[in-house]
Amino acid sequence: MATVENFNELPAHVWPRNAVRQEDGVVTVAGVPLPDLAEEYGTPLFVVDEDDFRSRCRDMATAFGGPGNVHYASKAFLTKTIARWVDEEGLALDIASINELGIALAAGFPASRITAHGNNKGVEFLRALVQNGVGHVVLDSAQELELLDYVAAGEGKIQDVLIRVKPGIEAHTHEFIATSHEDQKFGFSLASGSAFEAAKAANNAENLNLVGLHCHVGSQVFDAEGFKLAAERVLGLYSQIHSELGVALPELDLGGGYGIAYTAAEEPLNVAEVASDLLTAVGKMAAELGIDAPTVLVEPGRAIAGPSTVTIYEVGTTKDVHVDDDKTRRYIAVDGGMSDNIRPALYGSEYDARVVSRFAEGDPVSTRIVGSHCESGDILINDEIYPSDITSGDFLALAATGAYCYAMSSRYNAFTRPAVVSVRAGSSRLMLRRETLDDILSLEA
């Protein structure tokens, strides 16, 4: 049952590790009061706990046998600052566009520790990857395989590659972010034999060096068995490649997808336990197949960036809406919405929100938190119990917004993208400035 105390708690498995509510009710992250940040930088505002982000990088590195085995999935959230943090923690980086590559290189990230993804890379992207000495390219189609071989030959280089495999696992996740079943755009089918044919073609290509296979069962996955089943199926292909082609592939990239908690009712996947079980299982399976166990690589993005960040909004209007004869819902409008967080509208995602400028002490009421866009689906929190005293001028924060929020943001209704700041040891630093109308108008021809 919702209580006044619940409204003011900050669930540790949802909020940044350095988030604290003070005796006066104000929430701080890394010692910095969130209302002060809102006043200084404006709202909406993304606030990244740098030490939280870095500590999750280290947790992943420890779990999977070293930082070089962990590739931060930059699609979750990437800036030059983020790329530098990832570099300083020793992790590798995976990118999925030519501009993500550009951001990483602009930050000074070593190209040799970059892995490139994408189902439709094209000549320009492939050439940039080869010219800059990117460590791995994950091949997604036969056409791309031939094109990369051609591009690498033109540059006089041998490019290390992995083959993306669809092992046919139906991950327990949203349809749009499940990536390992058959009827979707990514990779080569294991069941049809096209994955083996791709591996054979890559092995025979003069300017490609096949170093491993890649698979990704989906995002926001909480069933660890899916990872082990995918590994088992893909290792069967390793055995086939070894026996028929005489090649021992040294790497197995199992992607990311480790689920995090967005609400107090959810529990994040225990990555340390999953990693231990997965690495043990891979070693055992490889031994049973009579092959050397490949080095396991992983690609967490959300599990690192997501919990490290909150988004601060200022509350605007509130209204009570009669839902039926015996129910009223409180609508709370904030100064952002689907332009800075499309996930609730796109995936039906849920979030945890708290007043961060004071203690909330009102009675529990059914509440819907909405944005300011001209769209009825502009909803951040659909139907939860919140205090009745949330009012105009309050600062409200959503937790776990570090992944796929700014990265998927838009200028819908000509809203400008929010600023992003990092906090550490009682101080803040601007990572990305807030966009302005001049930024929008600058694109006009």
Curated annotation (Swiss-Prot):
Pyridoxal 5'-phosphate binds at residues 257, 299-302, 404. Induction: Up-regulated by arginine and repressed by lysine. Pathway: Amino-acid biosynthesis; L-lysine biosynthesis via DAP pathway; L-lysine from DL-2,6-diaminopimelate: step 1/1. The active site is at residue 374. Its EC number is 4.1.1.20. One of its GO terms (molecular function) is diaminopimelate decarboxylase activity. One of its GO terms (biological process) is lysine biosynthetic process via diaminopimelate. InterPro entries: Ala_racemase/Decarboxylase_C (IPR009006), DAP_deCOOHase_LysA (IPR002986), De-COase2_C (IPR022643), De-COase2_CS (IPR022657), De-COase2_N (IPR022644), De-COase2_pyr-phos_BS (IPR022653), Orn/DAP/Arg_de-COase (IPR000183), PLP-binding_barrel (IPR029066). It catalyses: meso-2,6-diaminopimelate + H(+) = L-lysine + CO2. The modification N6-(pyridoxal phosphate)lysine is found at residue 75. Both, substrate and product of the catalyzed reaction are critical for cell growth. Belongs to the Orn/Lys/Arg decarboxylase class-II family. LysA subfamily. Homodimer. This is Diaminopimelate decarboxylase. The gene is lysA.
